[in-house]
């Protein structure tokens, strides 16, 4: 199973990959079905958003354990420096905006005009492993789809499959996108408290301070 291309450069071909969210008994809760025809058509015309208003790639149907389609994931570009991920789930469209913010990477989740959650990731990779923190407002989204989107996002954007080099990589990352304004710096502090926000920021700092012993 080969990786997707990096959607940070949302032009080009992508390939098959099946992802799954399972329970403790390894039974599938949700899994993806790659929309080959739709993805091929979208990738065939660079900058198709100029004509259609939106270019959607890396489209995957989300199926439940009974093989019923219950949602979709995809990456969408609507203009120069206007990109987002989209979750279709239970009749809702959840827009997911990525921002590189120095030592951390955040994805802000919106239901319409309202921010409902945030994914936070230190820009540190140890032994090809990434770590994510998820904060969602109560009753704003089903936990299984939030967890499954994180798997999809990680594979799409931070895939390390096939890499055998172990160690630690750190970097500072800044993104320049017209949707950067969707990032609300005080979202966690305002909705989960000052102490939780400080815990998250300390987690980011500790990730950079920790050094792998040689």
Which residues are covered by each model-predicted region?
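Intrinsically disordered, low-complexity proline/glycine-rich segments
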Residues: 1-214
């Amino acid at each position: 199973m080969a990786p997707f291309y990096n959607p940070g450069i949302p032009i080009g071909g992508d390939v098959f990959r099946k992802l799954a969210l399972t329970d403790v008994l390894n039974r599938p809760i949700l899994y993806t079905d790659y929309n080959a025809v739709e993805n091929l058509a979208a990738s065939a015309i660079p900058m198709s958003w100029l004509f259609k208003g939106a270019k959607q790639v890396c489209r995957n149907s989300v199926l439940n354990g009974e093989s019923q389609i219950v949602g979709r994931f995809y990456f969408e570009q609507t203009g120069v420096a206007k990109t987002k991920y989209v979750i279709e789930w239970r009749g809702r469209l959840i827009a997911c905006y990525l921002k590189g913010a120095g030592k951390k990477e955040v994805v802000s989740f919106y239901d319409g005009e309202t921010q409902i959650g945030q994914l936070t990731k230190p820009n540190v990779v140890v032994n090809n492993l990434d770590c994510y923190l998820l904060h969602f407002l109560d009753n704003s989204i089903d936990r299984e789809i939030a967890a499954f989107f994180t798997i999809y996002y990680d594979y799409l954007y931070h895939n390390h499959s096939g890499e055998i080099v172990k160690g630690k990589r750190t970097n500072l990352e800044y993104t320049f996108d017209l949707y950067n304004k969707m990032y609300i710096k005080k979202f966690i502090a305002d909705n989960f408290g000052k102490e939780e926000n400080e815990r998250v920021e300390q987690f980011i700092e500790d990730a950079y301070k920790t050094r792998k012993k040689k």
